[in-house]
């Protein structure tokens, strides 16, 4: 197949994920009708899907439908590898486990047991999961019939504002997700920097910059531009982040090799954010970029670069 604009093969498909609580007292479609809970639940879905399938460039939510008592999430897959990884996570129960934990935190409950169902067109894929090739063909046969819903863009902005707020709010895509397996090799304890305080700044090229936790847009900008140097940045970050210590970077490189440099870099920052929470700050990333002579990327990340390459 021909390569797409982002280097991804032109393999596109669509499926619907049906999500329902097993608890009578928890009706997800009703909870999603309330704006504050809607933002938190969107963040929970986004986090679980990113962990199971990859970045929004390869696995994207197009629309979230309310259908009492369920939520129905329309998904778009760009790339066979990402779809295969999602199917594996769904089949093995990893998606369900992650989503249950994320939704429980979003709704401030001890637990939210879920019933999931996956469909592509008329095919109910749960009965076909042992035949991955057939599932892939069913999903590929269903082309997305819409663009991303504008409401999801609004929810993404609201979620980003929560992430950047002074209090780590519910539904943040940087909170509460399980940290990945860490290296078994003994390592000295690192000094964890404190979370940023409201209005706290750091200096970049003599300019004061407001520090804040990293958000999804930061991760996407970094992944688009860092290229082969993502591992060098990872080595800088691992000095104060145990979750990135060896063999974590080699594992990321191997696991996402077929998805390309964008996905490897995106997953690096996603793992950093998962492990560090609100301590995964703009300042720490910018310092790692400067250390590796990636000043122009830091300028782009901070919004300081003009289109002609000069500082704003």
UniProtKB/Swiss-Prot annotation:
Citing just one GO molecular function, the answer is:
death domain binding
Highest taxon listed in the record's lineage: Eukaryota
Q: Which GO terms describe its biological process?
A: canonical NF-kappaB signal transduction; extrinsic apoptotic signaling pathway; positive regulation of canonical NF-kappaB signal transduction; positive regulation of cell migration; positive regulation of hair follicle development; positive regulation of inflammatory response; TRAIL-activated apoptotic signaling pathway; tumor necrosis factor-mediated signaling pathway
Instruction: Give the chief site where it resides.
Output: nucleus
Name the InterPro entries on file.
Answer: DEATH-like_dom_sf, Death_dom, TRADD, TRADD_N, TRADD_N_sf
The record's subcellular location field reads: Nucleus; Cytoplasm; Cytoplasm, Cytoskeleton
Matching PROSITE patterns: DEATH_DOMAIN (PS50017)
Give the UniProt keywords, A-Z: Apoptosis, Cytoplasm, Cytoskeleton, Nucleus
Q: Where is this motif: Nuclear export signal?
A: 147-163
What is a single cellular component term in the Gene Ontology annotation? plasma membrane
Q: Which SMART domains match?
A: DEATH (SM00005)
Which intervals of the chain are annotated as region Interaction with KRT14 and KRT18? Answer: 222-289
Please indicate the residue ranges that the annotation assigns to the motif Nuclear localization signal: 231-244
Q: Which residues form the Death domain?
A: 215-305
Q: Where is this region: Disordered?
A: 166-200
The protein's role, per its UniProt record: Adapter molecule for TNFRSF1A/TNFR1 that specifically associates with the cytoplasmic domain of activated TNFRSF1A/TNFR1 mediating its interaction with FADD. Overexpression of TRADD leads to two major TNF-induced responses, apoptosis and activation of NF-kappa-B. The nuclear form acts as a tumor suppressor by preventing ubiquitination and degradation of isoform p19ARF/ARF of CDKN2A by TRIP12: acts by interacting with TRIP12, leading to disrupt interaction between TRIP12 and isoform p19ARF/ARF of CDKN2A.
| Subunit details | Stimulation of TNF-alpha receptor TNFRSF1A leads to the formation of two distinct signaling complexes. Plasma membrane-bound complex I is composed of TNFRSF1A, TRADD, RIPK1, TRAF2 and BIRC2/c-IAP1 or BIRC3 which interacts with CHUCK/IKK-alpha, IKBKB/IKK-beta and IKBKG/IKK-gamma promoting cell survival. Subsequently, TRADD, RIPK1 and TRAF2 dissociate from TNFRSF1A and form cytoplasmic complex II with FADD and caspase CASP8 promoting cell apoptosis. Within complex I, interacts with TNFRSF1A/TNFR1, TRAF2 and kinase RIPK1.
The free-text domain remark for this protein reads: Requires the intact death domain to associate with TNFRSF1A/TNFR1.
PANTHER family tied to this protein:
TUMOR NECROSIS FACTOR RECEPTOR TYPE 1-ASSOCIATED DEATH DOMAIN PROTEIN
This chain's protein is named Tumor necrosis factor receptor type 1-associated DEATH domain protein
Gene this chain is encoded by: TRADD
